[in-house]
Amino acid sequence: MIISETNRREISKYLFKEGVLFAKKDFNLPQHPLIESVPNLQVIKLMQSFKSKEYVRETFAWMHYYWFLTNEGIDFLRTYLNLPSEIVPATLKKQQKPLGRPFGGGGDRPRGPPRGDGERRFGDRDGYRGGPKSGGEYGDKAGAPADYQPGFRGGAGGARQGFGRGAGGFGGGAAGSDLP
């Protein structure tokens, strides 16, 4: 596809500045949402070209293309756009850490009462927490006593008792069969 030099430069500038680019998979979209006056189709086609040259890495999810600039792509765009080596994409810049406390501080909401020594924060939930439990409704959960003898108190009342198909329950079956 023939892409004008101005559109190619606009796409390349945006890609180098941000380090990433996305486009909706809509070839009829008249303009890309982030790059002014460039059709969405031209963005997709230029990125396909960059992908084949391994300048970008492509991911597709939820009807959107996502392209991430590679090191080779950074070198290519730096020479194409005549940029010095001090300028780097936004994805390679270290983010500034905010000054101040990380988890709140100040704010409109009043803080709760201070906790005493050893006091649990969520005392109403202690029943759900682990630890030693009392006997309760179902007894101790430690296990069966040592002298416990389990037994089967089955019920077909007569002949041979068993499990599954050999039980001889409904209709006689194989165990108590009177058939010749």
UniProtKB/Swiss-Prot annotation:
Region (Disordered): 92-180
Cross-referenced InterPro entries: Plectin_eS10_N, Ribosomal_eS10, WH-like_DNA-bd_sf
Main location: cytoplasm
Comp. bias (Gly residues): 152-180
Keywords: Cytoplasm, Ribonucleoprotein, Ribosomal protein
GO molecular function: mRNA binding; structural constituent of ribosome
Pfam family, one: S10_plectin
One GO cellular component, as annotated: chloroplast
Gene Ontology terms describing biological process: axillary shoot meristem initiation; regulation of secondary shoot formation
Localization (cell): Cytoplasm
Basic and acidic residues: bias regions: 108-128
Keyword Flavoprotein annotated: no
Family note: Belongs to the eukaryotic ribosomal protein eS10 family.
Name the record gives this protein: Small ribosomal subunit protein eS10y
